[in-house]
From Swiss-Prot:
Swiss-Prot/TrEMBL GO biological process terms: carbohydrate metabolic process; cell division; cell wall organization; lipid glycosylation; peptidoglycan biosynthetic process; regulation of cell shape
Membrane disposition: Peripheral membrane protein
Pfam families: Glyco_tran_28_C, Glyco_transf_28
Binding residue positions for UDP-N-acetyl-alpha-D-glucosamine: S195, Q287
One of the record's GO cellular component terms: plasma membrane
Subcellular location: Cell membrane
Family (UniProt): Belongs to the glycosyltransferase 28 family. MurG subfamily.
Pathway(s) of this molecule: Cell wall biogenesis; peptidoglycan biosynthesis
Gene: murG
Function per UniProt: Cell wall formation. Catalyzes the transfer of a GlcNAc subunit on undecaprenyl-pyrophosphoryl-MurNAc-pentapeptide (lipid intermediate I) to form undecaprenyl-pyrophosphoryl-MurNAc-(pentapeptide)GlcNAc (lipid intermediate II).
EC number of the protein: 2.4.1.227
Protein name as annotated: UDP-N-acetylglucosamine--N-acetylmuramyl-(pentapeptide) pyrophosphoryl-undecaprenol N-acetylglucosamine transferase
Domain of life (superkingdom): Bacteria
Single GO term (MF): undecaprenyldiphospho-muramoylpentapeptide beta-N-acetylglucosaminyltransferase activity
Length: 352
């Protein structure tokens, strides 16, 4: 039986594509393994998926671009993670390793290359993260969501592979209950803060609940169960799975962070959106770059977190609603998306 090892983690964005691909390989008779951190979100997501995947936990350390005494300890963690991954590779002898990035992916990628296992990696953002910059040196091939510099000879631009589609599905019963609390004469605004929610969105909704619910139906994916609420014109919930796409479809506008997975999901269903990217003080600036790219393409509006107020947000919402057809036409004309089926066929072809 052919074997494939997946890796990637730290955030849901570094796991999502793996979760989409693994069932395809299982259906085709592959034995699927995953290398990650048992305390990480990758392990949680695989357990929730119920997929027939063997999980191997390794030591992992954070890769920092700045000086920290923790770097010294984490160098040893990464080194031990490489040794652990090497033993896993030599024991399994897989046909390939597929990496979605994140700090946990570096040891398996290095170990795979050392043991002669072909390495395929995927980069979602406009600029490569530190983990994938390291992984690229050991990779057989990299697939990218955005076009990359021509000097990166191992990169193939494939566009975004998303978990949502423009196909309409039956409404879940829970959605009917949510809609019964909404005023259908008002536009619906969905706040999405990534897998852990976004405190800045949660605070905005909390501080301006009265004003917001007078003018909009508000859906707030919070990442915090203590904020859960279903009341007049308001639905706040910590986490959703099956409701994710139905809520996307219900919304007239989405207010989101600038993670590539989410904004390309919005592009896939031509949904109006305002991007509030994580600032450089909290990230390497990849979300700022992603947001600027989408604004330049005419897909979205952006708003820096430091400028986020009720007034500034409402100005963006009003602009999008009044120019709805223009934004949707540009999104529908985009050629930057790839179906899961097409990407899977491309990957299988490259593996052969």
């Amino acid at each position: 039986m052919k074997k494939i090892v997946f890796t990637g983690g730290g955030t849901v964005g570094h796991v999502t594509l793996n979760l989409l691909l693994m069932p395809k390989f299982i259906e085709d008779g592959w034995e699927v393994h995953y290398i990650g951190d048992k305390r990480g979100i990758e392990h949680q997501e695989i357990l929730k998926s119920g997929l027939d995947v063997t999980f191997h936990s390794i030591a992992t350390g954070k890769l920092r671009r700045y000086f920290s005494w923790q770097n010294m300890l984490d160098v040893f963690k990464v080194g031990w993670g490489i040794v652990q991954s090497l033993f896993i590779m030599l024991r399994l002898r897989p046909q390939t390793l597929f990496s979605k990035g994140g700090f946990v992916s570096v040891p398996p990628v290095i170990a795979a290359r050392v043991s002669g296992v072909p390495v395929f990696i995927h980069e979602s953002d406009l600029s490569m993260g530190l983990a994938n910059k390291i992984a690229y040196k050991f990779a057989t091939k990299m697939y990218s969501t955005f076009e990359q510099a021509s000097s990166l000879s191992k990169v193939e631009h494939v566009g975004a592979v998303t978990k949502v589609s423009d196909q309409k599905n039956p409404e879940p019963d829970e959605l009917v209950d949510i809609q019964s609390h909404f005023n259908h004469k008002l536009p619906t605004v969905l706040f999405v803060g990534g897998s852990a929610g976004a405190r800045v969105f949660n605070q905005l909704v909390t501080d301006h609940k009265k004003e917001l619910t007078e003018r909009y139906n508000i859906i707030n994916l919070t990442g915090d169960s203590s904020l859960n609420e279903l009341s007049q014109n308001l639905f706040r919930v910590d986490y959703v799975t099956d409701l994710y796409q139905p809520l996307m479809e219900l919304a007239d506008i989405v207010v989101t962070r600038g993670g590539a997975n989410t904004i390309f999901e919005l592009l896939a269903i031509a949904k109006l959106h305002v991007i509030v990217p994580l600032g450089r003080e909290a990230s390497r600036g990849d979300q700022i770059e992603n947001a600027a790219y989408f604004v330049k393409k005419g897909y979205a509006e952006d708003l820096q977190e430091s400028d986020l107020t009720l007034d500034s947000l409402e100005e963006k919402l009003s602009h999008l609603l009044s120019h709805k057809e223009d934004y949707q036409a540009k999104m529908k004309a985009s050629k930057e998306l790839k179906s899961l089926a097409d990407f899977y066929q491309l990957l299988k072809k490259d593996l052969s």
